[in-house]
């Protein structure tokens, strides 16, 4: 582990282990701590970067919790200043923009995990309730994603007829529904369940499958399909 001095303080730098591991085996072989350490590059006075990465992930519980946090919780971690906070906010925003910029025809939602990650990138930071529909072809490739309805902090009005009309226009074989709960709690309301039933019945009339409805909170989600509601 190398160290350098700055204005009387010792800044502990990362050794080349995680970088060398990435170059030799690929990024997928690295742990969350190792990837985070590569991005942060240096630790804080008296703390090497791997220890800092582990401490950050333990404090916030997950990568999602870390990258979506505001500045206040960082003040509880000694030595983490505005520069480190800015780095973390930048990587979170880059991840969201990466998902948004991927061409639709290259994005196939082949697993619940991919679907959840994709939708979290679209919805987790929204300050109002929005209702998004992903229109899919027969191979589960995205034809288009549309935010069809936008509401208030606690409610969004959804019209099944408009969803069906757009699905037919796009010749979609299936759709995935999603909306966010800005409050942070992902548990669906009774109204969420009722509107989902109405959409499913409307889509059945034109032979379009509703594959799932995901409710996205802060650091949590609920899948109607996983709970057996669809």
Swiss-Prot record:
Zinc found in the keyword field: yes
Entry keywords, A to Z: Hydrolase, Metal-binding, Metalloprotease, Protease, Zinc
InterPro entries in alphabetical order: MPN (IPR037518), RadC_JAB (IPR025657), RuvA_2-like (IPR010994), UPF0758 (IPR001405), UPF0758_CS (IPR020891), UPF0758_N (IPR046778), UPF0758_YicR (IPR022820)
Domain MPN residues, every copy: 108-230
Binding site for Zn(2+): 179, 181, 192
CDD domains named among the record's database cross-references: MPN_DUF2466
Residue numbers covered by motif JAMM motif: 179-192
Superkingdom of this protein's organism: Bacteria
GO MF entry, a single one: metallopeptidase activity
Keyword Transferase part of the UniProt annotation: no
GO BP term, pick one: proteolysis
PANTHER family linked to this entry: DNA REPAIR PROTEIN RADC (PTHR30471), UPF0758 PROTEIN YEES-RELATED (PTHR30471:SF3)
Similarity remark: Belongs to the UPF0758 family. YicR subfamily.
Name of the featured protein: UPF0758 protein ESA_04094
Organism listed in the record: Cronobacter sakazakii (strain ATCC BAA-894)
């Amino acid at each position: 582990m190398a160290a350098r001095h700055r204005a009387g303080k010792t800044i502990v730098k990362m050794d080349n282990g995680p970088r060398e591991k990435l170059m030799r085996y690929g990024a997928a072989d690295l742990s969350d701590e190792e990837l985070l350490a590569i991005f942060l590059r240096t630790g804080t006075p008296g703390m090497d970067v791997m220890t800092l990465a582990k401490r950050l992930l333990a404090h916030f519980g997950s990568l999602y919790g870390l990258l979506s946090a505001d500045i206040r919780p960082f003040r509880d971690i000694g030595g983490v200043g505005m520069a480190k906070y800015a780095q973390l906010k930048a990587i979170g925003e880059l991840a969201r923009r990466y998902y948004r910029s991927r061409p639709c025809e290259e994005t196939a939602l082949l697993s619940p995990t991919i679907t959840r990650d994709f939708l979290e990138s679209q919805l987790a930071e929204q300050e109002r309730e929005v209702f998004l529909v992903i229109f899919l072809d027969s191979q589960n490739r995205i034809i288009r994603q549309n935010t069809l309805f936008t509401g208030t902090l606690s409610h969004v009005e959804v019209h099944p007829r408009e969803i069906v009309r757009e699905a037919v226009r796009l010749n979609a074989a299936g759709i995935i529904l999603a909306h966010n709960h800005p409050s942070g709690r992902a548990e669906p309301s009774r109204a969420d369940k009722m509107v989902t039933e109405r959409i499913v019945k409307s889509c059945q009339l034109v032979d379009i499958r509703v594959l799932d409805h995901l409710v996205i909170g802060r650091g949590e989600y609920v899948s109607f399909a996983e709970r057996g509601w669809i």
